[in-house]
Curated annotation (Swiss-Prot):
The keyword Transmembrane helix does not apply. The modification N5-methylglutamine is found at Q234. GO terms for molecular function: translation release factor activity, codon specific. Keywords: Cytoplasm, Methylation, Protein biosynthesis. Belongs to the prokaryotic/mitochondrial release factor family. HAMAP family: Rel_fac_1 (MF_00093). The lineage of its organism: Bacteria, Bacillati, Actinomycetota, Actinomycetes, Micrococcales. This is Peptide chain release factor 1. Methylated by PrmC. Methylation increases the termination efficiency of RF1. InterPro entries: PCRF, Pep_chain_release_fac_I, Pep_chain_release_fac_I_sf, Prokaryotic/Mito_RF, RF-1. It is found in: Cytoplasm. PROSITE patterns: RF_PROK_I. GO terms for cellular component: cytoplasm. Gene3D superfamilies: 3.30.160.20, 3.30.70.1660, 6.10.140.1950.
Length: 357
């Protein structure tokens, strides 16, 4: 059992040796890559040694129990501990998404429902911001278009963590949030007290660590400048500070107008563009590799309804995992971990099943 781990143990030893060489840090890109891989392997190495120690302890206990019945009571306990350790190790050996350790750019856009959808988009932004705070992550609004009533027609926020451990990475925790989030409640604009249904779309993009990591040919870019506009379309700037960047090979378009200068908007736009191109490239790899199992619950498609937030019943329901709870008020205040964990566990189980096939 776990014969394949030896190769990972050898790789871990090799990486530790490299990280112990000061010369490695002259290449920061390589050092970050080695650091991320080391963090991923650390958990596997620790889990394997735990399993290996319990296996040896169980073998010794069985030998002693054969000679002295008093030791027999230890055998069932060690068997249970060994099975638990084996299950943990099996999960750690599931091939991880290569982007799990990355930070993310989270996009929330009001969908059908007009002003109410924009208000709900703002509620989702607050939910994610508070969840990020609970995990010690930092958030930064990159771009936002506010609605007349104070919500968001669309907003982009960068979420940054501090752990190199892929299992604790921002993308690993948030990547299943992409899709349509539907809300059922009485809008603030509703005078008759009727419940309305509206929606907001969420997109989660893994962020490129450094610009050099993803080379973009400047000849592949079309850059347009125009004047910024605020709620209602009124001009908020007398200079052409807003920027629209089109990546011609992929057709990806990013518009940015939050910053005061054209240069700042261009830098922010390129940051988002790199994230979108990285996600686009990964989608192409997934599509080209017929043997790679696509995630059953992660989507880059805003049109797939993934969750319903029912305010009158204080209920939240995830349509992919079957998760349901009546603590919507707590969820909207950032208590999102059980919902997210249900998606992670479903994905892990699907990956385990695929390995067993």
């Amino acid at each position: 059992m776990f014969e394949s781990v030896q190769g990972l143990l050898d790789e871990h030893d090799s990486i530790q040796a490299q990280l112990g060489d000061p010369a490695v840090y002259a290449d920061q890109r390589l050092a970050r890559k080695l650091g991320r891989r080391s963090a991923q392997l650390n958990g596997i190495v620790e889990a394997y040694h735990r399993w290996e120690g319990l296996r040896d302890d169980l073998s010794a206990a069985r030998e002693m129990a054969a000679e002295d019945p008093e030791f027999a009571a230890e055998v069932p306990e060690l068997e249970a501990s060994l099975e638990t350790a084996a299950a943990k190790l099996r999960r750690l050996l599931i091939p991880r998404d290569p982007d799990d350790a990355r930070n993310v750019i989270l996009e929330v856009k009001g969908g059908e429902g007009g002003d109410e959808a924009a208000l709900f988009a703002g509620d989702l932004l607050r939910m994610y911001t508070r969840y990020a705070e609970s995990r010690g992550w930092k958030t930064e609004i990159i771009s936002a278009t506010e609605s007349d009533l104070g919500g968001y027609k669309d907003v982009q926020v960068a979420v940054k963590g501090s752990s190199n451990d892929p299992a604790e990475g921002v993308y690993a925790r948030l990547k299943f949030e992409g899709g349509v989030h539907r809300v059922q409640r009485v809008p603030v604009t509703e005078s008759q007290g009727r419940i309305h249904t509206s929606a907001a779309g969420v997109l989660v993009l893994p962020e490129v660590d450094e610009p050099e990591e993803l080379e973009i040919n400047q000849n592949d870019l079309k850059i347009d400048v125009y004047r910024s506009s605020g709620p209602g379309g009124q001009s908020v700037n007398t200079t052409d500070s807003a920027v629209r960047i089109t990546h011609l090979p992929t057709g990806i378009v990013v518009a940015m107008q939050n910053e005061k200068s054209q240069l700042q908007n261009r830098e922010a736009g390129m940051r988002v563009l790199r994230a979108r191109i990285l996600a686009h490239q990964q989608e192409q790899i997934d599509a080209a590799n017929s043997e790679q199992r696509k995630s059953q619950i992660r989507t880059m498609d805003r049109s797939e309804r993934i969750r319903t937030y029912n305010y009158p019943e204080n209920r939240i329901a995830d349509h992919r995992t079957g998760y349901k709870a009546y603590n919507l008020d707590q969820v909207m205040n950032g208590d999102l971990e059980p919902v997210i964990q249900s998606a992670i566990e479903m994905d892990e189980q699907a990956r385990l099943d695929a390995i067993g096939d």
